[in-house]
Every structure is written in C-alpha cells, then in structure tokens.
C-alpha cells in the first residue's frame, strides 16, 4: 500500500503542478506511481510475409489490487501481491488497432512466427499448478486456443523454428536426479560452491508429434537460442563450461542432429553472441572478443574489456573472417542476416544513442545504416523489405515501429503508454565537456520541468552501472532511474558517461582499467563543474547516487569530497579486496585490477576502495540493496554502514528481502524510489518531500 506519508504529501504534486509553466499547459509532473503504471514492449516478431507484427507488453498486474493515489480512497485488496506479467499482442504492419492475443494469469512472452506464418510460438508458465514450468506454446492463427508443445520438467528458454516449420530447437535446464530430489525434500542438500552446475542443453521437438530429443549433452551449458542450418540437419549455438555469469570460456559449436556429433568452430574463447546461420547455409555469423584482450583465455580469472568483433565463419573451409574496422570502432551486437544473405545487420550503442550497422559480405565493408536512434534489434520479413522493431525517445518508453531496411522513415504502430500525454516532462539534452586531462566526456542532462535559463536548480548526479555500460538519451522513468520524477520536482539530473563507459570507442572503454576512482571520478566531477558553469546547477544543493558500479562511485565520491549534501549508494562496492573473494564475477573484478589480489596488488585494491577513506565521509548516506545479492554481496554495504555508524556519521542501510542485484518486487521498487527521494531532499533542501 502507499504509505501515509506519501498520501499526506500528495498535495505537493498538485501545488507544483499548478506552478508549472505555460508550456506544460494543464499537464502534471510525473510521480513514482506513474512509473509503476508504465508498460514496456519487447519481443518484436514480424510475420514472414511482413503483414503483421507480434510483440509482448509487460507491466505490473493484479486483478484485485491497486494502491490508491487518492488519500480519500483506500487501497484495494490490501496486502495482495503484485506480479509483473507480459502478454502477446498483434498489430498490422500497415497500421490499425492492436489486438491482445493472450490473457493468462501467468503471462506470455517471446513470440515467434512459424515460417509459414500460420502459427505463433511463445513461452509461458500457464500450465496447471503453482510450480508449472515455462514451456513453449503454439497459437494457431486461423483460430483455436493455444496448446502446450513442450513438457519439460524444467524451464524452457531460447528457441527457434526450423526453416520448414516442422521442428523447434530449444534450451532446457537439466533435471535433478531423483536421489537429489529426495535429499532436497528431506533437507539433506549441502551445496558445493562453484561445482555441480545445473546446465542448459539443446533439444529438438517435432511440432506434429511433440516428441523431444536432446541433441547436445555434456559439460557445456548453452545460452541464447540455437540457430538452425537451412537444411535442418544441424544447429549452431553458444556454450560455456559453467553457468557462472561472464564465464569467458564461451565458444560457438555446431551439432549434427542425426548423430549428435559436436564440433567447436571457434579457436579463441569469449564468444559474445549466439550465432546466426546465413540463408544459404554456407556461413555462420557471431561476435567474439579478440584473444589479445584476454591474458589467460583458459581461466575464469580473466574477462573481456573491449569491442566485440563480428565474425563470419565459412562452414566448408573452417576459415573465419574478422570484419572489425578500427576506424569505425564500435562493438558489434547480435547479428541478423538479410534474406538475400548479402548483408549482416546489428544494433550497437553509439555515444548516447543506438545505431544500426550493416556488413556487406561482397565488398567486405562495414557501414552505418542509421544513427541517433534508440532502436532495438530488428525483426525482418522473409523478402527482406520490411523491419519491425522497438523505438524509444527521451520523451516516452519504446513503441513498435516498422520501416524498410534504411530505417529512415519509421512508422509507429502502437501507443503503449497513452497516459503520458497528461504528464509534463523535463527536457533531455546531451552535453559534452573536457576532463582534467583534456579528454572529451559526454553525458545526458535532464533539465527540470519548466526550466528557465539563468535560474539555478538543485542537481542530482547519477552514475551508471558497469562500468562497461553507458547512459543513453532515453526515457528516464523506471525504478532504477526515475529522473523524470526528479525533474518534475524542480531538479536537474546529470547522467555522466565517464571513461570506462561503452559506446565511445574501445580505447575509452578500457581507459579505467587499473584506474577505478581515478580518471572516471575526475570525468564526473568536471561534468558537475560544467553544469554549474552553464548556470543550471546550484552548487550548494547537489546530491549523488548510483547502483552497482554507480554505487561504488557513490561510496568513492563521498570518501573523496564533501561537495554533495546527500548521497544514495545502491548495491555498491566499498571494499574491492573482499568484493573479489565473494562476488559471482571475480574475473570481471580481477581484469580491472591486474588479476587476483596478491601481495603486489593488494595495496592497489585498498587504494581504490572507499572503505580505506571512510574517515573522510561526512555526507549523509542512504544505502539500499537486495538481501540476496550475489553480484555485489551484502557485506559490501554492511562494511561501509558499520564503519560509518561507528564513527557517528549519518547513515541508513535498507535491505530488500528476496531480491538479487536488482529489485523485482512491486513494493520494493516503490520504496526504493520514495525512500531515496525523501532522504536526498531532506539533506539537500532541508525538508522532506515525498512524491507518491
């Protein structure tokens, strides 16, 4: 339910709305409840003939429970649990009214057309019983109810139709042996750390008979969807020896279905994407990180930092062509072949946006097709004339669009969040500045609602996670980054992309190796200075926050400067030495700090840990984290909290039960946003202001 404090201060929103500028007309500022009501679209699939688009719409649902934003009206079904669910929709590629195709309480996602366009496959756990597993379901498009195709004892994931539509390849997790099931039942179930992984293997099921056969078994776990050869005799897939996240020992394999023989086709580890078979069956496209970036490719202790290269593997000769162009300097995304096999398309992050690139097979050239679009991976029609995809903007979440393969004139097919027309939004601008060493740095600046030049505003700085990530110019309205709510309350929000971020070339991405808290910190602080110089930020009213690596940067910032009046550290790293020994991605940490902590490297681990400088911290700090986080174990938050608490500093630590590295439960997401907003406004502005 919405807290009494939230209800009691709901009038703040109304008062602020009345003071909004004429440009916003009668629209009101965004609230956290507005964020919780937003829908998201994904899983776009264009029918083979290009006439229809299937897609999944997800959002929070509960048939009997909705928190009330009206203080006079109580919550319905108080205490009931909210669930996030997706359902399959369809719309004509020429336009028209979208139609919902699925309605189950368990939800559905990942729609995929059969090659003849007569059926639509999707994933759902809509089977009977509370412990129903995710299975593949088939919806006949000429009428009738969807039926369950697979009957796996464990969850099914990535899948793909064979080219003739008679079979589907899919992934399923290994089942527990009966002896293990019995031990689990009686709670005789000790776990050996980093051993006995439950792997995912590739299966093939006959659509007509529903007979499923495992085709790739062994000490490999397959990820992503398998890719069929055009003649239906083989599958290509990506696999690694363990299920450990970011296991660098990932390769591409081909399995012959008839005899289940397996062939590894990569000679260097670190495959970055699932493979895609060319229409003529002669070539397989996938991405990989060059071995030069991996010091010990046979070890979990080394991990990639750099651009993924698009590789074309000739099936007959076994030769691989690296298509990377250092002059273009982008990281390749998941490859998609055009229907004629002449080009391979991929989307990639490029500065504060996305771009689509095409590799021309004949000319051996990589070219940008379109830039400065927040575009998702396109789904192509069989004749190669049309593409369907998601497309977002700074002012709205993504909707479904269709266009030709130039992507020049996208046509909008959906209106997923029409309620946004009643909400006034802050303006988004991409800005650049120079760091202390002259390095150009870019960031996204969200201006306060009703911004007036010459007026100074409170500034919130949000550091992104990663560090191999970037903040784009997209819509800032989700539990992790509710920037539009802050803008609606009169704040400017800066999202810097310091060195170490992706999207700005490989050299920039690798620039913070052995330098966490160094150049990246200076990049951020010079960005803050730039916003102050622009006359936008009030230097006496600034706050800082971030999650994951952004949480590390938050802890580091408050240990290095007292410029910020308040801060919020989300799932952040405070002690890099203990982080290395307890995280589920030790190799990723080790890559940035010259391998495992040793007598030689220990001083550096300590020198870049905020816990070392905890005596310097005076900024009031809110710490938030999932209680079951394995990526950044909760000890990182507890260490920093205890050190600050014992020194008499202003600090609060909040754990969210059952949550991992991110927050997935309704009331946890809502509390995270409201609590951080109350904390930051209290210590920055001197008064609590909680938005519903």
Model feature map: region roles:
Residues 45, 56-57, 61-65, 169-171, ...:
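Non-catalytic accessory segments flanking enzyme active sites
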Residues 57-87, 102-109, 121-137, 145, ...:
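A flexible loop/linker signature enriched in serine peptidases of the S9 family
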Residues 84, 207, 462, 479-489, ...:
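Active-site-proximal cap/loop segments of hydrolase catalytic domains
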Residues 455-465:
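Short beta-strand element of the alpha/beta-hydrolase
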